[in-house]
Amino acid sequence: MAITDVAEYAHLSDADLEALGVELDAIRRDIEGSRGEKDSAYIRRTIAFQRFLDIAARLVIAGTRGKVGWALGTTALTIAKSIENMELGHNIGHGQWDWMNDPEIHSSTWEWDMAGVSSQWRYSHNYRHHMFTNVIGVDDDLGFGVLRVTRDQKWQRSNLFQPLRNVLLALMFEWGIAAHGLHSEHERATTDAEKSAVTHALIRKMARQAGKDYVFLPALSLRRWRRTLTANVAANLLRNVWAYIVIACGHFADGAEKFTPAALEGETKPEWYLRQMLGTANFDVGPIMAFLSGNLCYQIEHHLFPDLPSNRYAEIAQRVRGVCANYDLPYTTGPLVRQYLLTFRTVSKLALPDRFLTATSDDAPETASENRFRNVDTPYVSRDGTGDRRRRGLVTAIRDRQIRRHSRKFVHAGTSAH
């Protein structure tokens, strides 16, 4: 089952939990206090570069004849669309640049180059997902309603098709996000008129988006309309797949924990911080790939501070790593390919009923709870007043459990041999 008592699972005392919150609050204050011209210049350069790349890509597609020109133009267009969606649309929509008071670069005015309506996405994502990250039955992003990513989600026959659903979701990700936002808006609407209004808003946005990419821009290419159309289709599909990989690795990889609704009862800010740290995962890439991911390779930092500028996440990550080390908490990260393979493994194996799975629901790679440590002799050492930060926390508890498990297997193997 999923985690109910987050502090118990993390092996933190009440005093440690409060101290953790103080340290993370200090990081927020430091970044907020140091925002300035360098940050605003960064986002303006990014907008200018993205628009230049978008125009250049379309000129290459329309102005060249061979396959090489089409491939180069389509690649550039894919990159431009990825930057617009992730480093711009996603992060501006989080209010990361609202402090600039620039009406163009503001969460309330920016409309992204995607099928969904930005305002609908902001409610489903910024509130329902970020406030209730990985809480089963509350966070709609947990499997997006089509994937079973924890054993706490009841198995159904339709889950057998999960590997195929996974591929289709990746290819159609922007349309899935659009439908996801509409679903959230319908749930909070109180009248049929409100539901109708948000539905028509989405239909209009989808029509504009499809008309731009698949009718208007190809028509501008005249006799080369097929070349432009296929490039736009390919760029949108590739952007969708990339966005899906980034998001899936940040939430479904091993180590990104899930929580029961009971974990929300009386939740304090330090407990919210802790849930975000345990419920997300990073992946390791260089600065270029980090930029192309919208700096969402720093998913842990993004969930701790979703409204701080994305260009500061690398700096924040160094301090968050230190906090995790101080409290013996895992800092879940790994190479991008490895993180996605772990995600795909989870999606594939949870397509099967639980009776075909070997690990328990309290101690599986994708699903764990505080029960994995109960009735186990794991000494707990809190920090004392001497400044000694050595402790036995979650990282140590997991390591000790793995050692005991391997020891039991070794003993069992030796006994069987005799």
Regions found by a protein language model. Name each.
Residues 1-20, 362-418:
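Transit-peptide-like, low-complexity N-terminal presequences
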Residues 1-56:
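Low-complexity, highly charged intrinsically disordered N-terminal segments
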Residues 71-81, 132, 136-276, 281, ...:
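Hydrophobic transmembrane alpha-helical segments that form the core helix bundle
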Residues 46-72, 216-221:
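Alpha-helical phosphate/pyrophosphate-handling elements in metalloenzyme active cores
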Residues 36-41, 58-65, 418:
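Catalytic cores of phosphodiester-bond-cleaving enzymes
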Residues 39-42, 107-111, 196-201, 223-228, ...:
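Glycine- and acidic
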Residues 9, 24-41, 252-283, 305, ...:
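Polar-ligand-bearing catalytic/cofactor-coordination segments
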